[in-house]
């Protein structure tokens, strides 16, 4: 929106042409989203508390979590609003990738909203039935995957790129591309949701990964940089750097209120949306494997749940972990909540740096 206005003014006042630079708009998007979160956060928290939209806590979980009962939840709506408003302000609204990513984020957020609303307002502990949750998120992910596949006009847009090697890729075909894209978008969404169990645990790694994906998006959308670094050139993908900047800024603003002891939780409305956003960006810029590396924390949390359930059924009631997801295992092992969170952040920093190194190590 502001881009079109600035370019119009730039016809007469050349100084406004600076807003055509993606790097500037990415920084401005991050700052705008951060300020929106700061400005609106207290009011959102007060409204959630007044409506008694509070978190329910599992009786069989760590005892330290019992004090969290009643903490306002569904605060992820604040993140989504900040991302949407900022992207509409600073993004190029003629770019199809911006709209696909934004609509996927809003769609997954809507599913999470219904799930949270049923849990905390209608006092339904199950929320939205799992089959319906996966059905709706699957439909949204498939719609995005099909759109991206059908509108691809270059082979690189649907190939699986192998990091650490120059010009090593595998053609997936339409069916393979749609299947992989569905798995990445839906899988990342639910992985972030599983990770969101401690104060600040999910949001900071999400911000880190989003920041790294902003770099990948900028490189992929720049003909010169993509050629030099051996990254497939995806025309228009650079605009997703602006979206990622908005996500990172909104996430940091939310962390201000979500840091221990949390004043608000993001709920499914935030976790599902943010995970889907990361997955969609990774699909567009063809960095699914790198997302798997940088989001290793999300992968580990998900695998811990899967392994726990499978082993429990196969062994007749035995468990590998004290409790799943993985962060609860360490809590019950004696780690304080803040120790788990900060140590998992450190691991994510290492993984993100390793993921970024794939740009040069080819």
Curated annotation (Swiss-Prot):
- Membrane-spanning ranges: 27-47, 73-93, 97-117, 132-152, 160-180, 200-220, 237-257, 264-284, 289-309, 339-359
Query: Localized where?
Result: Cell inner membrane
Q: Which GO terms describe its biological process?
A: cell division; cell wall organization; peptidoglycan biosynthetic process; regulation of cell shape
User: Which top-level group of life is the source organism from?
Assistant: Bacteria
**The EC number(s) this enzyme carries:** 2.7.8.13
Keyword entries, A-Z: Cell cycle, Cell division, Cell inner membrane, Cell membrane, Cell shape, Cell wall biogenesis/degradation, Magnesium, Membrane, Metal-binding, Peptidoglycan synthesis, Transferase, Transmembrane, Transmembrane helix
Quote the Pfam families the UniProt record gives: Glycos_transf_4 (PF00953), MraY_sig1 (PF10555)
List the InterPro entries: Glycosyl_transferase_4, PNAcMuramoyl-5peptid_Trfase, PNAcMuramoyl-5peptid_Trfase_CS
The principal location of this protein is: membrane
Protein name per UniProt: Phospho-N-acetylmuramoyl-pentapeptide-transferase
- Organism equals Aromatoleum aromaticum (strain DSM 19018 / LMG 30748 / EbN1) (Azoarcus sp. (strain EbN1))
């Amino acid at each position: 929106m502001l881009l079109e206005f600035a370019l119009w003014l730039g016809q007469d006042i050349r100084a406004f042409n600076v807003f055509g630079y993606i790097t500037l708009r990415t920084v401005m998007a991050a700052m705008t989203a951060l300020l929106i979160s700061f400005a609106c956060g207290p009011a959102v928290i007060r409204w959630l508390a007044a409506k008694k939209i509070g978190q329910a806590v599992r009786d069989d979980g760590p005892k330290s979590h019992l004090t969290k009962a009643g903490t306002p939840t569904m605060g992820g709506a604040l993140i989504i609003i900040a991302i949407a408003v900022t992207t509409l302000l600073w993004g190029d609204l003629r770019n199809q990738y911006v709209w696909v990513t934004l609509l996927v984020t809003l769609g997954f957020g809507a599913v999470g909203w219904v799930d949270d609303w049923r849990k905390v307002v209608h006092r339904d502990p199950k929320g939205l039935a799992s089959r319906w949750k996966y059905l709706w998120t699957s439909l949204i992910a498939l719609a995005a995957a099909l759109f991206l596949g059908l509108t691809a006009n270059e082979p690189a847009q649907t190939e699986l790129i192998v990091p650490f090697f120059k010009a090593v890729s595998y053609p997936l075909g339409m069916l393979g591309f749609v299947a992989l894209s569905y798995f990445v978008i839906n899988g990342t969404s639910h992985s972030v949701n599983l990770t969101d169990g401690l104060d600040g645990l999910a949001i900071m790694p999400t911000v880190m990964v989003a920041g790294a994906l902003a770099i990948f998006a900028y490189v992929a959308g720049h003909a010169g940089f993509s050629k030099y670094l051996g990254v497939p050139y995806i025309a228009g993908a650079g605009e997703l750097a602006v979206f990622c900047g908005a996500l990172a800024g909104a996430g940091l603003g939310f962390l201000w209120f979500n840091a221990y002891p949390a004043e608000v939780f993001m709920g499914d409305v935030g976790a599902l949306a943010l995970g889907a956003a990361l997955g969609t960006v990774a699909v567009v810029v063809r960095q699914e494997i790198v997302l798997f590396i940088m989001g290793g924390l999300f992968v580990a949390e998900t695998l811990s749940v899967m392994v726990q359930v499978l082993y429990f059924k196969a062994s007749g009631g035995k468990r590998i972990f004290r409790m799943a997801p993985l962060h609860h295992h360490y809590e019950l092992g004696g780690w304080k909540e803040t120790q788990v969170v900060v140590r998992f952040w450190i691991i994510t920093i290492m993984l993100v740096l390793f993921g970024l190194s794939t740009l040069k190590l080819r």
